[in-house]
Design a protein with these regions (language model features):
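Core RecA-like ATPase module of SF1/SF2 helicases and allied nucleic-acid translocases
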Residues: 2-4, 8-11, 18-21, 26, ...
Length: 199
């Protein structure tokens, strides 16, 4: 059976030699959860936090073995803060959380302290998570734009970046697309479509 990663490479016309072996291992049959949600109602942090909580509950993901990957840290910082405040659950980040801004001045320090062994839901940019993997990966896709607010610039929306995110999963992938039109048709065709809103 052709893997999601190989299909992605074929559809977007590139080969990433660094991840080729990993792509061979990521057969669709090995995943217990390979789901896609298109959120076309705009980016709302409260709603996204609820959706992530629903995914964790419905799919039975262990938060200690789950990472939320985003294309940039702006959206991740807001969701992580909201998740932590609404659930009172521990989180681990590769960036400085909103309420720790004055304690640490450099995201590099957070990246160096990051480990998958720490207990809590992990939050990371795709770029910072290179070299790591997790049993459960929830990927947040953002709309392309000027890079301000929750939009991303084109350099963060390259197929190689999304491919890297896909290949971080050992077992389960859920993609929440928040208006990224470039990849919508591919994931809609190749993954199980699910709506976690109000569940």
């Amino acid at each position: 059976m052709t893997s999601l990663a190989k299909k992605f490479q074929n559809d977007f016309g590139f080969i990433n030699a660094d991840n080729f072996e990993k792509a061979e291992l990521l057969q669709d049959g090995m995943f217990t959860c390979l789901k896609y949600m298109y959120n076309n109602s705009g980016i709302n942090i409260n709603k996204l936090t609820q959706i992530i909580s629903s995914i964790l509950r419905i799919e039975g993901f262990d938060v200690n073995e789950t990472v939320i990957l985003g294309q940039n840290s702006i959206i991740l910082k807001d969701i992580e803060y909201n998740y932590r405040k609404t659930t009172n659950e521990a989180t681990i980040t590769t960036f400085i959380p909103i309420d720790e801004k004055n304690k640490l001045k450099d995201d590099t320090v957070k990246k160096l302290k990051f480990t998958m062994m720490d207990r809590g839901l992990k939050f990371s940019t795709i770029h910072s998570f290179q070299g790591w993997d997790a049993a459960n990966v929830i990927i947040l896709l953002q709309p392309e734009g000027d890079g301000k607010g929750y939009t991303i610039n084109s350099s963060l929306n390259k197929p190689e970046v999304i491919y890297t995110a896909i290949t971080r999963s050992k077992q389960n992938i859920v993609i929440i697309n928040n208006g990224n039109t470039l990849y919508h048709n591919f994931f809609k065709r190749n993954m199980i479509n699910e709506d976690y809103t109000n569940k």
